[in-house]
């Protein structure tokens, strides 16, 4: 199969990369600003953002996973971060399928609790996105897992507590989180970092 052609069925091209049926080989994809690796490009396309995405840039200050903000054209003509794309560190999380099963289970449960409480679903619970093929995460050609969630506008992540009020608010939020999960079936959770 030559670059630039359409693959008719699942196959492995000479580079050793598995290609899904109907996907256009990588050389015909639109170049996305900020995307400098094949894995990141594959992930952007796997979640369905490739044709509309304005640009991608590193996001946050995490030390475990590799995180990117995905910017899309806004109605006002300005590019806006709408999604967070994250490569899960498999050196820490050996079973990404179990991590994602936990995340989808807990977030859906929390969203139902927030809905019942009349809360703001867009701000009070993470909203994860499945791949175009309906999977909870995408695995790139190197076996690296990627997940995606909606970006929460005007959210803040503190690396260090700067004032006592911040510590108080985080403790209050964590307590509320635990209360909401009080009846969650803990036996359905996987141990994602074994002892």
List where the protein language model places each region.
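Glycine-rich hexapeptide-repeat left-handed beta-helix
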Residues: 1-35
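Compositionally biased, intrinsically disordered low-complexity regions
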Residues: 4-6, 24, 36, 50-52, ...
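General structural signal for secondary-structure boundaries
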Residues: 28-31, 35-40, 95, 163, ...
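Juxta-kinase regulatory segment immediately upstream of eukaryotic protein kinase catalytic domains
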Residues: 32-57, 106, 110
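Conserved ATP-binding subdomain of kinase catalytic cores across diverse folds
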Residues: 55-195
């Amino acid at each position: 199969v030559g670059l630039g052609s359409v693959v008719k069925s699942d196959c492995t091209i000479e580079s050793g990369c598995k290609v899904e049926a109907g996907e256009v080989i990588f050389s015909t994809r639109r170049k996305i600003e900020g995307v400098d690796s094949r894995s990141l490009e594959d992930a952007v396309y796997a979640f369905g953002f490739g044709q509309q995405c304005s640009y991608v840039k590193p996001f946050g200050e995490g030390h475990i996973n590799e995180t990117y903000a995905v910017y899309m054209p806004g109605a006002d003509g300005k590019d806006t971060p709408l999604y967070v794309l994250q490569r899960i560190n498999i050196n820490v999380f050996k079973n990404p399928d179990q991590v994602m099963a936990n995340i989808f289970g807990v977030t859906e449960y929390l969203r139902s609790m927030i809905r019942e409480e009349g809360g703001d679903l867009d701000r009070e619970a993470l909203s994860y996105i499945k791949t175009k093929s309906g999977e909870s995460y995408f695995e790139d050609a190197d076996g690296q897992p990627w997940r995606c969630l909606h970006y929460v506008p005007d959210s803040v992540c503190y690396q260090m507590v700067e004032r006592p009020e911040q510590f108080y608010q985080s403790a209050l939020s964590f307590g509320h989180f635990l209360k909401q999960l009080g009846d969650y079936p803990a036996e359905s959770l996987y141990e994602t970092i074994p002892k």
